[in-house]
Structure formats: structure tokens, C-alpha cells
From Swiss-Prot:
<dbReference type="GO" id="GO:0046982">
    <property type="term" value="F:protein heterodimerization activity"/>
</dbReference>
<comment type="function">
    <text>Regulator of mitochondrial fusion: acts by forming homo- and heterodimers at the mitochondrial outer membrane and facilitating the formation of pld6/MitoPLD dimers. May act by regulating phospholipid metabolism via pld6/MitoPLD.</text>
</comment>
<feature type="compositionally biased region" description="Low complexity">
    <location>
        <begin position="123"/>
        <end position="134"/>
    </location>
</feature>
<keyword id="KW-0812">Transmembrane</keyword>
<keyword id="KW-0496">Mitochondrion</keyword>
<dbReference type="GO" id="GO:0005741">
    <property type="term" value="C:mitochondrial outer membrane"/>
</dbReference>
<keyword id="KW-0472">Membrane</keyword>
<protein>
    <recommendedName>
        <fullName>Mitoguardin 2</fullName>
    </recommendedName>
</protein>
<dbReference type="InterPro" id="IPR019392">
    <property type="entry name" value="Miga"/>
</dbReference>
<keyword id="KW-1000">Mitochondrion outer membrane</keyword>
<feature type="transmembrane region" description="Helical">
    <location>
        <begin position="42"/>
        <end position="62"/>
    </location>
</feature>
<dbReference type="GO" id="GO:0008053">
    <property type="term" value="P:mitochondrial fusion"/>
</dbReference>
<feature type="region of interest" description="Disordered">
    <location>
        <begin position="87"/>
        <end position="134"/>
    </location>
</feature>
<comment type="similarity">
    <text>Belongs to the mitoguardin family.</text>
</comment>
<dbReference type="Pfam" id="PF10265">
    <property type="entry name" value="Miga"/>
</dbReference>
<dbReference type="GO" id="GO:0005886">
    <property type="term" value="C:plasma membrane"/>
</dbReference>
<feature type="compositionally biased region" description="Low complexity">
    <location>
        <begin position="106"/>
        <end position="116"/>
    </location>
</feature>
Length: 589
């Protein structure tokens, strides 16, 4: 029997020829001997052979016609279903006879593209040697059918209830409002980046390069300094109004009267050019028109028309901002991003006010005792959580405080700290910035050798703790040799650090989760305390006196939270008071 077929022959044709060869094979093999025994005449034999061959051919033809008729009915039903309303025949519910079809999940029939992909993947998984042109044509027919189903509109695949749900979701004012606020926050982030980049470029690049970057936003007739100043002023004014708008509305749905007063909350000047832009925006319906209208509105916003002022009365802040513009306020490290300030100028202005407030606070002996005791209790609580004896720390801490309170050592201490970059002898610059914030930054990027020891699973926890403490002591010992004053303030600080640094390092970097949680809570409370101190909404920058009162209130509240978490008794009885009578000489205005 011949099972080979030509390259251009289809599967059906090859099957038909194979079946047609069966009678010939039977006749040549068995027919001659069997028919010879029957002793039929040659004519009768030919009639029987022709009858058998015709029967086989007729059966094959009937089967082929039946398949074509079934395909024609299916195509007609599909076309008619799409015309009438639209559900294709393949999606209509049909009777499922096999158990395999009943076990099909609905997720498999939700997407027609998944069907076509499964079909094509099944065809492509066949052996390539068994493919013929007919198989390729069959695959192409399946692909075309599936692609035509995919190309059909989404309506037939979705019920009217789903359409109504989507329309209600898209037209829901609350969802649209929340989406708009998310985009608004993204725009705020971009504006902040633009302002920070512009300020850094002005401080790090020549004026000619800054002019090239800001040339598109500034008028051609102005000088380089005025161009950068006007552009920065525009950005500051825009950010200020945007922050006010964001705080006023937030992410929740505002009341109707607040939405009606949206125009007033922006506080944009209603000039004639803006009225024309508003009328243009009302007539436009595309996002491109809105985008260009917003760009033109930003160009019409002038620095002289919208001054950069805080929402609350902040006379002290405004005076400090003037000093910042004249370059009279300096710092060791800019903490703009960490403390959530608008820009570097905003940070410097608030820093100047905070310095003056701490000077007012520390004029009172009770406040000096309060801040010194709070710091001691916090570190003691951390060491107790780490199961360490705080006796050595307490002795060195008291000795450092006695040295710092001696007025005859201030000149030496100032010279030491100036060599470390501290530009102001203030509690904030020394205790909060130089000691605490630098310690947190150092712990965020430890040496690779220390990390290798801590991440070694074959070493015990006690060995890791001992190795980390030895590394800290070695670093402090090497730094002691480089001190300009062997028995100065830095030397006393290193004596305290010998007891505290290993505990903090093992707490932040070590494998003990409970100790790590305690150290992270301690860090977060300190950082949030500083953020509240530099927030115009949390403290009053109207006068130095009011700012000092708010900082003392923040210090009491944060110390109660942190000491309560560490299980240490609070120091309420040592809370001092803010001096009422202060002179301008004391404030260094």
C-alpha cells in the first residue's frame, strides 16, 4: 500500500487515495485466488470490482460534502450574528457533551486571543517533518479566523452590564478627582526637581551655562542674574501655590463650596491675558489645547505679581529669607530633602530661625538640664534594650557635659568643630546635625568588610558583635591620633562613642530583629522631630519667641514617646521654661 504523497497534496486527498488503493490491494493479494475459486466470469469480476470502488468513492465524496456544508452554515451563522447585534457564534452558549469541555474554566474563554494562541502553539508543536502545505494552510486558516475574531469590536465580547459598569467607573467624579490629584503630585515632583537643578547649576556652573539652560524661560533683554532669578521666582511661586492647593484639597473629595472656590484658592492674578486664555480653554476640548493654554498661563505669571509668601504670618522666616538671599546664612550640610523643605533657600532660612530659637531656649538652666538629661536617657534606654551595661557611657557622658559647659573651653571647642565643618556653635549644629545625623548617614553606608562579616552565616552572633565592636574601637583609636587637641571636646565625644557606636552599629546592621526595630524607631523619631521643627504648619515662625516655645513643646512630646517606647522614665520634672524677656542682642538679629 502506498502511503507516500506529493508535496503539494492535501491531507484529505492523500487519505482518499490511500483508501481507494485498498480494493486494488485486496484484489491483487486475495481477490485473484478467491475469485478463481468462485469460478466467476471475467465480466462479473470486473462488475464487482467497479461496484466496490464506486462505493468507497461515493462514501468519501459524501463525507467531503458534509464537511463543506457544515462550514458554510457556520460562516453564515457567524455573519448573521455579527450583523444582528453582535455575538459571534463561537461565543454563544452551546451544549457541552464531553467532560473535558465541562471542566473548562471561564478564564480560558474570556479572551479570544488566548484561544488563537493556544491553537497556533499546538500546531507549531508538531514535528516539522510531518508538516505539509495543507497543514500550513490549515494553520493559516485558524490564524486568520482567530485574528478576525480579535479584530471584531470589543462590544460583542462584553455584556451590556459590563459596559454600563465601565461607563459608570470612568464617569465617576471621585475616581477622576483622585487620578487628577495623583498627576498633580507628579507635576509637583517635576517642578521641585527643576528648581533644585536650577539652583545647583547656578552654584556649580558658570553663568554662561546657566544662561543657556534658562534662556527659553526668561526674556531676552534681561541680564543673566535677573533671568535666573525671575525663573526661580516663578517656580517658587508656582510651587507655593501648588502646595497650598494640595494641602487644602488633599486626596479626598472636597465639599461643593470648596470646589466652587477653586479659582480663589489658586490666587492667580486675573489679568486681561488670563481672561482670554480662560475663554480659549472653555472652547477647547482636547488635551493639547489645555496643555498649551497652561504653558501660556505660566508664561504670563510674573514674579512681581505673585510674591512668595508663607500661608501663616512668618515675620521671622521672611527676615531670615532676606539674609539667605544676601548670602549671610551658611551651613555644613544641606538637609533639604531629608527635612522636607521646598528648596535650599527655604532650608537655610528655617535653619537660621531654629538656631536663634535654641539660643533662646538654652538661656534657661532648666532647659539645659532637660536637653542634657533627655539625651542621656535615650542612649541609656538603647543600651538597656541591647542588654549592655550603661555605666561606662554615663561616666563619659557626664564628663563631656562638664567640659562643654566650661566657658574657658569654648574657644578651643569652636576651633575643633570649625575644622570639622561646623559653622555655628549651636545646639542644632553640634548635637542634632554633627553628632546624630552624621551617625545615621554613616550607618546607612557601612564598609564592605563589615557587611561581609555580618552576612556570613557560618559565624555566630556573638562573634559578629565582637568583631563589629573591635572595628569601631579601631576606627576611633585611629581618629584619636589625628586630633589637634588631645583632651578637647572631640576627644570626650570619642570616649562616649566607644560605648555607643558598637551598640548602634550592631542594632542597625546586626541579625537581631528586635534590636533593629528599636534602633529604627529611634532614628525615625529623631528625623520626624527635625521635620516638624522645619515645617511652617507645625511650628510658628512669626517670632523667635513663639518658635522657641513650639520647639520646646515638640521636644517634650517626642521625648515622651521615645522614652516610653524604650521603657525609661520620662523627665517631666526637669522640663524648663522659655525665657520671656529677650533682647535683640541675645537673638543676634
Amino acid at each position: 500500500m502506498a502511503f507516500q504523497r506529493a508535496e503539494g497534496m492535501s491531507i484529505i486527498q492523500a487519505l482518499a487515495m490511500t483508501v481507494a488503493e485498498i480494493p486494488v490491494f485486496l484484489y491483487t493479494t486475495f481477490g485473484q485466488s478467491t475469485f478463481s475459486q468462485l469460478r466467476l466470469s471475467p465480466g462479473l469480476r470486473k462488475v464487482l470490482f467497479a461496484t466496490a470502488l464506486g462505493t468507497v468513492a461515493l462514501a468519501l465524496a459524501a463525507h467531503q460534502l458534509k464537511r463543506r456544508k457544515h462550514k458554510k452554515k457556520q460562516i453564515t451563522a457567524d455573519n448573521g450574528g455579527l450583523k444582528l447585534g453582535g455575538v459571534p457564534g463561537s461565543v454563544l452558549p452551546v451544549r457541552r457533551s464531553s467532560s473535558a469541555k465541562k471542566g473548562y474554566s471561564r478564564s480560558r474563554v474570556q479572551s479570544p486571543s488566548s484561544k488563537s494562541n493556544d491553537t497556533l502553539s499546538g500546531i507549531s508543536s508538531l514535528d516539522p517533518s510531518k508538516h505539509s502545505s495543507s497543514s500550513h494552510s490549515l494553520a493559516s486558516v485558524v490564524a486568520v479566523n482567530s485574528s478576525s475574531i480579535n479584530a471584531a469590536p470589543a462590544g460583542p465580547w462584553e455584556s451590556p452590564e459590563m459596559d454600563e459598569t465601565l461607563e459608570e467607573g470612568d464617569s465617576n467624579a471621585e475616581n477622576l478627582y483622585i487620578q487628577g490629584m495623583e498627576l498633580f503630585e507628579e507635576a509637583l515632583h517635576k517642578w521641585e526637581q527643576a528648581l533644585n537643578v536650577g539652583q545647583r547649576c547656578r552654584s556649580n556652573t558658570p553663568a554662561s551655562q546657566v544662561n543657556d539652560l534658562l534662556n527659553q524661560s526668561c526674556s531676552e533683554g534681561l541680564s543673566e542674574d535677573s533671568q535666573s532669578g525671575h525663573f526661580a521666582g516663578k517656580l517658587e511661586a508656582l510651587l507655593y501655590r501648588a502646595y497650598n492647593l494640595q494641602e487644602e484639597f488633599g486626596t479626598s473629595i472636597p465639599p461643593d463650596d470648596l470646589l466652587m472656590d477653586l479659582e480663589g484658592s489658586l490666587i492667580f492674578p486675573l489679568v486681561e491675558s488670563r481672561r482670554a486664555l480662560m475663554m480659549d480653554d472653555e472652547g477647547s476640548s482636547t488635551s493639547e489645547d489645555s496643555f498649551f493654554s497652561a504653558a501660556e498661563l505660566f508664561e504670563t505669571l510674573q514674579l512681581n505679581e505673585v510674591p512668595f509668601l508663607p500661608t501663616k504670618p512668618a515675620a521671622a522666616y521672611e527676615e531670615a529669607l532676606k539674609l539667605v538671599h544676601t548670602g549671610e546664612v551658611a551651613c555644613r550640610t544641606l538637609r533639604t530633602e531629608l527635612l522636607g523643605c521646598y528648596n535650599d533657600q527655604d532650608f537655610l532660612a528655617k535653619l537660621h530661625c531654629v538656631r536663634q530659637a535654641f539660643e533662646v531656649l538654652l538661656l534657661d538652666d532648666g532647659n539645659q538640664l532637660f536637653f542634657g538629661e533627655v539625651g542621656k536617657q535615650m542612649i541609656t534606654g538603647l543600651m538597656q534594650k541591647a542588654e549592655k551595661n550603661p555605666k561606662g557611657f554615663l561616666e563619659n557622658y557626664e564628663e563631656m557635659l562638664r567640659y562643654a559647659l566650661k566657658q574657658d573651653t569654648w574657644a578651643t571647642t569652636q576651633r575643633e568643630l570649625k575644622g570639622r565643618g561646623v559653622v555655628c556653635m549651636n545646639f542644632f549644629d553640634i548635637a542634632l546635625d554633627f553628632i546624630l545625623m552624621d551617625a545615621f548617614e554613616d550607618l546607612e553606608s557601612p564598609p564592605s568588610s563589615v557587611l561581609a562579616v555580618l552576612r556570613n552565616r557560618w559565624l555566630s552572633d556573638s562573634f559578629k558583635e565582637t568583631a563589629l565592636a573591635t572595628a569601631c574601637w579601631s576606627v576611633l583609636k585611629a581618629k584619636r591620633r589625628l586630633l589637634m587637641v588631645p583632651d578637647g571636646f572631640i576627644s570626650h565625644f570619642y570616649s562616649v562613642s566607644e560605648h555607643v557606636s558598637p551598640v548602634l552599629a550592631y542594632g542597625f546592621l546586626g541579625p537581631k530583629e528586635h534590636l533593629t526595630e528599636v534602633c529604627n524607631f529611634f532614628k525615625n523619631q529623631i528625623v520626624q522631630y527635625l521635620k516638624d521643627m522645619f515645617d511652617l504648619d507645625n511650628v510658628r515662625y512669626s517670632t523667635i519667641q513663639s518658635l522657641a516655645e513650639d520647639i520646646l513643646h515638640l521636644s517634650r512630646r517626642r521625648s515622651d514617646i521615645l522614652l516610653g517606647y524604650l521603657g525609661v522614665e520620662t523627665v517631666r520634672e526637669m522640663n524648663g521654661a522659655v525665657p520671656v524677656q529677650t533682647t535683640e542682642a541675645e537673638l543676634d538679629l
